[in-house]
């Protein structure tokens, strides 16, 4: 839940060099644009320019650190955050970000200190508190963690069900099973749509050996969310206890579909297949498991047992020797190895191992004054997901958030969640002009535009453009290429100020480097020179949309997801901006009524404005022009579902899947 927060600096200035002085405010803003759209390499280049021009600006170091965090360059981020704090010791978010970095680097005490400092400067900031929760958790300071959790819950109450789930987990870690159950039971009653709540209560029931109740809870959790491998693993354990091996194996196989190298699922499945006599399948799982983790000695021990049964005594001896090397007082390993040596007629080695096993057992009986587990004892029973050491890993237990994409500092929440439904979805993005296409998203024969084809034919020596709905972040080389293009085209414009194509191509280059102000200006110049260019109007609308997303994000808590939530059409703060871009779409459609991308993009905007009937009408118009427009079917399907017309929505999703948007099938499955 630790989200990045980007401060916005919106000042209308140019990116160009003026009288030898870099306009740093504009560079900061464009760098923030790049951050917002996940172009972290590009963002770093902008912040580098600011730092080179004005090394005393602490925000540039801080924002560059954010970009480095998103690229998992934690040491580089730490250096930048140290510099930012050195220049200004009163920026709470710098301490918050550095705390996050310290957690990633394993310096948990320093992380705790930084989160506490951030809270001194901003005492009730929930994000900072959540950061400190993580630091406490990683240090096993569960009492302190519980105190912070209670503070958040008093402050935010029912708005934080995931934090309430965390409370149940921490209570469980503190050994208060009854309190943990009460907490989880309360959440299930108040937030029955949360799979994590049902899974949490199921785990506690399971640990309390209330197996029927646990099974019932896991059934609900899995019906609400079908992609949690741990839920399937634990339900498989419950099925196994009921001797329903078929159901147990089915659940474990499903867990492995979701998490291919899940060690618990592989181990547990090997135990069941061994028990029913399918030694080869059990051995295959154990081979995979040892390949993943050669230090999982329970797997080696189980593999040795199976190898013996299959007559592979040398393989058994190899595994048992590894175990004995690690656990020299584990008597069963000596006994088993003695059997294999005996089968290979190595009587001396067999006798030696058997004597060692007898001596260890004798000493163990003499010194057995406690029921505590011996250090050299392997747990060869089925594993319960998140019940032992894994219970302290918050990311895997109960799933703190129903949105998997939001547990990293540099990741943003999914777009367009359908509210009050148990399906995590995002609509397909708008189409934009780009020289870079991802083949799975764009099929040229289906996505034909006469205007774009003419443009590409006329300018074969320039970059070829495509309509795409999935943009790629730029590499260093591509960033340099587009800046060079901007310089070259600027020289052409200086020589000929009346060339429509030069402004159009420079605008596209500005868009690619996230310089939206200059892009809008150039698209506007292109429109002045050729008012019949539907492409220029549509491109200007898209740049205005991107600017608006960043502006909304800045004004609503600095989160990207907030910028993509539905907004009221009457919101005066942004109504003029929406009006401008809708006007551009309408003009593009008026010039080229066959430009189905413009209908689709406008439909996405109308959906944002909660005018769902208008959105459906526009998606329908786009589909009328292009019967193979998968993205339009997909988004129209989501809109129908939101309006409660599930049958129509599923039909559209089915068509989208047929046309290649395979995520539609997963969504259909969840809706059933």
Where are these regions (language model features)?
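Structural marker of alpha-solenoid helical repeat scaffolds
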Residues: 53, 87, 121, 155-156, ...
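Eukaryotic alpha-helical solenoid repeat scaffolds
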Residues: 309, 325-502, 556-577
